[in-house]
From Swiss-Prot:
Record's protein name: Leucine-rich repeat-containing protein 58
Organism of derivation: Homo sapiens (Human)
LRR repeat start-end pairs: 45-66, 69-91, 92-113, 121-143, 144-166, 167-189, 190-211, 213-234, 236-256
PROSITE patterns found in the cross-reference section: LRR
SMART domains: LRR_TYP
Keywords, comma-separated and alphabetical: Leucine-rich repeat, Phosphoprotein, Repeat
Gene, per the UniProt record: LRRC58
Lineage: Eukaryota, Metazoa, Chordata, Craniata, Vertebrata
Chain positions with Phosphoserine modification: S24
Record region (Disordered): 340-361
Gene3D superfamilies in alphabetical order: Ribonuclease Inhibitor
Keyword Transit peptide appears in the UniProt entry: no
Record GO biological process: intracellular signal transduction
Low complexity bias spans: 340-351
Length: 371
């Protein structure tokens, strides 16, 4: 082992550890330059460069040359406002840790990132605890990314282009100001871990049920009142965190119900009574309308609906240990009671109607995984 000042180089592990030494960019620059040509071989063999918790305000220029095989760079806990073009010279970099800095805005990442070799090499990127208000577009071109962490920023939304990251296995977006989840998030076939906690999310798109590899889903501390019934398709899900959400126990009884239009009533009659028709009998718009019918999920009903329906929360057993509030759409208010009664395996509808809302909620919430 060779020690130069307080920095430690471990020859066997090809690692330079300069953590928590309160060094500035200038000091680091001087040290790297001082190593010079006599230690060129050691620099070229370096695989890991650890610089967290110092006083760096920019990346040292020396990174732009002499580190061709560097695989891990940790610059977390500094005062970086931008990652300069020196980063693009690290052609084999696999892991970049730059959390808890001051990164944000369009100039935070180097120009040409999406066209650089990093697009093919970088697998782990941690930018949590910075000042990003939106996901930088260049990040969405890093096709080799397996782990992306952007927690604790100021993100307002998730771009639809997130689906470009087809190799992504872990996505951490907790602690932001996200209100909506784009349906395109469901197009990530390799995603195992999805963290969306501590945001302002009000609903979950049913397309998330396409994440067939998902094992852990963190949704705690949001504004969710229900989950889509399609979430039951996540058969590999092992962890589900829902604490801190206003998940409802009963649907609001006095929810305004708008009666069906005459067009919908006529279309319902055609569907329910199996009245035959051909493409030559009706205009194209009516044919398309009739084709948009949805079946009422109440097994005792057998009806259909088009634009007008009644929403109802139904608690459903999931994986044998969770009771999840899922949204159902019924064709009329008359379908509410039978369907609701069938959905409660441990508490009858009459009991639920007679109990105080708060006490029902408290007991039900104990049956939902709280994380």
């Amino acid at each position: 082992m060779e020690e130069a000042g307080a920095a430690v180089v471990t020859a066997g592990e090809a690692e330079l550890n300069w953590s928590r030494l309160s060094v500035s960019t200038e000091t680091l620059e001087s040290e790297l330059e001082a190593r010079g040509e006599e230690r060129r071989g050691a620099r070229e063999a370096l695989l890991r460069l650890l610089l967290p918790h110092n006083r760096l305000v920019s990346l040292p220029r020396a990174l732009g040359s002499g580190f061709p095989h560097l695989q891990l760079l940790d610059v977390s806990g500094n005062a970086l406002t931008a990652l300069g073009p020196e980063l693009l010279a690290l052609r084999g970099l696999r892991t970049l840790l730059a959390k808890n800095n001051r990164l944000g805005g369009p100039s935070a990442l180097p120009k040409g990132l999406a066209q650089s070799p990093l697009c093919r090499s970088l697998q782990v990127l941690n930018l949590s605890g910075n000042c990003f208000q939106e996901v930088p577009a260049s990040l969405l071109e890093l096709r080799a990314l397996q782990t992306l962490s952007l927690g604790g920023n100021q993100l307002q939304s998730i771009p639809a282009e997130i689906e470009n990251l087809q190799s992504l296995e872990c996505l951490y977006l907790g602690g932001n100001f996200i209100k909506e989840i784009p349906p395109e998030l469901g197009n990530l076939p390799s995603l195992n871990y999805l963290v969306l906690c501590d945001n302002k999310i009000q609903s979950i798109p049913p397309q998330l049920s396409q994440l067939h590899s998902l094992r852990s889903l963190s949704l705690h501390n949001n504004l969710l009142t229900y989950l889509p019934r399609e979430i039951l398709n996540l058969i590999h899900l092992e962890e589900l965190s829902l604490r801190g959400n206003p998940l409802v126990v009963r649907f609001v009884r006095d929810l305004t119900y708008d009666p069906p239009t005459l067009l919908e009533l006529a279309a319902r009659t055609i569907k329910i009574r199996n009245i035959s028709y051909t493409p030559y009998d009706l205009p194209g718009n009516l044919l398309r309308y009739l084709g948009s019918a949805s079946n009422c999920p109440n097994p005792k009903c057998g009806g259909v609906y088009f634009d007008c329906c009644v929403r109802q929360i139904k608690f459903v057993d999931f994986c044998g240990k969770y009771r999840l509030p899922l949204m159902h759409y019924l064709c009329s208010p008359e379908c509410s009671s039978p369907c609701s009664s069938a959905s409660h395996s441990s508490t009858s509808q009459s009991e639920s109607d007679s109990e105080d809302e708060a006490s029902v909620a408290a007991r039900r919430m104990q049956k939902v995984l709280l994380g």
